[in-house]
Amino acid sequence: MRILLLIISIILAQSKYPADSVLTSPNATIIEKAAVLPIAGWQRLSHNTRLLDCQFYPSCSQYGAIAIKEKGILKGIPMTADRIVRCNPSAFFNHLHMRGGFHDADGRLIDHPTSHLIASKKKSPIVAGILSIFPGAGRVYAGRWFDGFMGFVMVYFTASSAIDASKRDNYFGKSFAYSMAAIFYTGEIYGAYRSAKYYQPQ
């Protein structure tokens, strides 16, 4: 019952947090709103805690909301998983290496879902995507070894959770864990492709 009340309060709340704009948008489909709902819930926590400040602009949660709204669920969710993997201790170094921009107001790393970066021909995005059959390998090929390590860890943990949930025969837990594993796995393929295509040293 508490979860239902939380969901209703998030849906009916005023647009105080960035993802709320998608929830209240008349142009967003019910499926997009359902996908953005957990992001809106997360923003109610992360935007009120300095420890959870994101190093990127827009933040990972807002990036996810924008990606789902602009690209649809099938592309937006893997894009969000890719961004979560890239939000790691190597992000600042990687951003400098490719001469990325910084947000004037607070110095965060600018990284929008719709990239305005020029495609690089140094690495093959197709090869990076194919190598991602083994999670993390495509990012390593693209020169992002720490992102590759983080991607492998995310896929490993979500897949392990799915296998454990299967052993316990917990339908909800199993469905959720397999969904998360699939999201991060597809995010790895997308992320490796994008890393090889855009995120190369300038």
Features from the language model and the residues they span:
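Sec-dependent N-terminal signal peptides
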Residues: 2-12
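Hydrophobic alpha-helical membrane segments
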Residues: 21-202
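Cleaved targeting-peptide boundary
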Residues: 12-21
